[in-house]
Regions:
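Amphipathic alpha-helix face/heptad-repeat signature
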Residues: 53-56, 109, 138, 173
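A generic secondary-structure signal for well-formed alpha-helical elements
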Residues: 91, 96, 117-124, 146
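Acidic/His-rich, divalent-metal-binding segments that scaffold phosphate/diphosphate chemistry
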Residues: 1-99, 105
Length: 177
């Protein structure tokens, strides 16, 4: 059973000796436990749907790491943090009990994930430096999960580049994973 600490993204982050990497790695372990519990509700809402718990997020991270190979080293600490957060949160829109009709929840879950992300950031990550900017990026990456390439290329958010905690963060790179 894959665990966050066993993913290439988490290992890459923990290899780095920067303050950002240390802070982000610690936060990710806490967040993965919280999100893992929340994602269990997907099984209740969609009992016939394949498992989309925390292991699914870890499988995605491992798959993307295999695809990008050594290019993982060119990602900034903050890019890794944002991408891992998006992998953890991308299916939370399917766990929002009473949020939407079941038949539309699945198709809209990439956008609906913003509700879970917003609530989690406000309640559990209120001390995170540059919280709002990181939340915006994670929300966009999750939204991009439901877009085709043409729609992404037409979206101005796709082209956003930010510098957060001294790190470049490129939506275009993170959203196409």
């Amino acid at each position: 059973m894959p665990a966050l600490k066993d993913t290439a993204f988490f290992k890459e982050l923990t290899k780095r000796k920067s303050d950002n990497a240390t802070i982000y790695a610690g936060k990710l372990l806490e967040i993965s436990d919280d999100v893992g519990s929340f994602l269990e509700y997907t099984k209740t809402t969609f009992p016939d749907y394949p498992d989309h718990g925390i292991q699914h997020s870890c499988r995605i991270l491992n798959y993307v790491a295999r695809v990008i190979g050594t290019q993982i080293c060119s990602l900034s600490d903050t890019e890794i943090f944002c991408f891992v957060l998006a992998a953890l949160f991308h299916d939370t829109g399917m766990s929002l009990v009473g949020f939407a009709a079941k038949n539309t929840m699945r198709s809209k879950h990439p956008v609906n994930a913003a509700v879970a992300i917003d609530e989690y950031f406000n309640k559990a990550l209120f001390t995170l430096k540059n919280k709002e900017r990181i939340k915006t990026i994670v929300t966009y990456i999750c939204k991009a999960h439901g877009l085709d390439l043409d729609a992404m290329y037409k979206d101005p958010e796709f082209y956003v580049v930010d510098t957060i905690n001294g790190d470049n963060v490129r939506n275009s790179i993170l959203s196409v994973f």
